[in-house]
Amino acid sequence: MRSAQSKRSQSTATGERTLHIGRDRPIRISAGHRLQHHDGKCSRPHGHNYEISVEITGQLTDEGWVVDKGTVTAVVSDWDHRFLLEDGDPLVDAFREAGDGDAVVVLEQPPTAEVMGVVLERKLHDALPETVSAVSVTVAETPALTAGPN
């Protein structure tokens, strides 16, 4: 019996695990954006109190975790109190000319919740150790609009 428990402990320590950050208490950031080519009110500058949750799968590190939560929150928090704009939006230059260029995050695509999730997944994957095999991000823009993996 003891050897079976020992083998089970070894497989847990060496197998992949998933870390859930923000599942019950999301990471909250406030950010502005606009959808430049939208026909409705979303083309105007506005903001949201985003709620973000992250799932990270990977091997346990020597420290006994998949990743340090502080690394994840630092990447996400980099967008807190920033304005997200699509590359080519004239507001990018307006922010820079006003001396607020550091307040802008320029994305290659429109700053929708879906795009935000994909970009944050890439940024996290780049910032995390090679022991990480998968990163998924869910972004809630409003209680009625949440984007994440299938």
Curated annotation (Swiss-Prot):
One family from Pfam that matches here is PTPS
Q: Where is this region: Disordered?
A: 1-22
**Out of the domains of life, which is the source?**
Archaea
Q: Which cofactor does it need?
A: Zn(2+)
Which is an annotated GO molecular function term of this record?
metal ion binding
Reply yes or no: does the keyword Cell membrane apply.
no
Q: Which residues form the active site?
A: C42 (proton acceptor), H81 (charge relay system), E141 (charge relay system)
Query: What residue spans carry the Polar residues bias annotation?
Result: 1-15
Q: Which UniProt keywords apply?
A: Lyase, Metal-binding, Plasmid, Zinc
Query: Where along the chain is Zn(2+) bound?
Result: H33, H46, H48
Cofactor comment text: Binds 1 zinc ion per subunit.
Further information in the entry reads: The active site is at the interface between 2 subunits. The proton acceptor Cys is on one subunit, and the charge relay system is on the other subunit.
Q: What does this protein do?
A: Catalyzes the conversion of 7,8-dihydroneopterin triphosphate (H2NTP) to 6-carboxy-5,6,7,8-tetrahydropterin (CPH4) and acetaldehyde.
State the protein's name.
Probable 6-carboxy-5,6,7,8-tetrahydropterin synthase
